[in-house]
Amino acid sequence: MNELRRRWQVMSQRERLMALACGGLVVLCLLYYLIWAPWQESVRQWQMTVERERQTVRWMQQQPPRFRRRKVRGGRXPVAISANGIGAQSAVRYGITVLRMQPQESQVSVTLARSDFNNLLHWLAELEQKNGVITQGIDVTAVPNSPGIVEVTRLSLERVL
């Protein structure tokens, strides 16, 4: 420490001023790179996260009501589904064979034969849009070595007015 003090005293006024300026610059750089820049980066990341979450909320609000949790009020209550309600005729149009239908309270449990996955999705969409029948649950298994063909072992449907 004495060596530093001796060197400081040997320096001219101009050299001392330059050393102080350089020291101040080093301190400012350290503050910027060790504190300010990481803090700004974390703020930017949080802002991006908040914006992504806002976009997700907007997307969820724009989705059709079938993706929202149903509320049983205001005349929108589950009703028993008849065989016609499931749209057996529309199933045939889409090449879907209904093997078994079993009523369960306000739902109907349906077992289907192997069918084309895209046709199944179109059929379920038509049931919802035209008949007010929503899918409560579905178990789908891909058929090995048959691209696009699935086996539906359980399909629970419910009609909502």
UniProtKB/Swiss-Prot annotation:
UniProt xrefs under Gene3D superfamilies: General secretion pathway protein M, EpsM
| Annotated transmembrane regions | 17-37
Topology check: give the Periplasmic ranges: 38-161
Its placement in the membrane is given as:
Single-pass membrane protein
Please indicate the ranges of residues that lie on the Cytoplasmic side: 1-16
* GO annotation (BP), single: protein secretion by the type II secretion system
According to its UniProt record, where is this protein mainly located? membrane
Question: Could you tell me which SUPFAM superfamilies the record lists for this protein?
Answer: General secretion pathway protein M, EpsM
Q: Where in the cell is it found?
A: Cell inner membrane
Query: Keywords of this protein's UniProt record, alphabetized?
Result: Cell inner membrane, Cell membrane, Membrane, Protein transport, Transmembrane, Transmembrane helix, Transport
What Gene Ontology terms describe where this protein resides (cellular component)? Answer: plasma membrane; type II protein secretion system complex
In terms of superkingdom, the source organism counts as Bacteria
Oligomer status and interactors: Type II secretion system is composed of four main components: the outer membrane complex, the inner membrane complex, the cytoplasmic secretion ATPase and the periplasm-spanning pseudopilus. Forms homodimers. Interacts with OutL/GspL. Interacts with OutE/GspE and OutF/GspF.
Query: What is the purpose of this protein?
Result: Inner membrane component of the type II secretion system required for the energy-dependent secretion of extracellular factors such as proteases and toxins from the periplasm. Plays a role in the complex assembly and recruits OutL resulting in a stable complex in the inner membrane. Provides thus a link between the energy-providing OutE protein in the cytoplasm and the rest of the T2SS machinery.
Family stated for the protein in its record: Belongs to the GSP M family.
Name-wise, this protein is Type II secretion system protein M
**Organism the protein comes from:** Dickeya chrysanthemi
Gene name of this polypeptide: outM
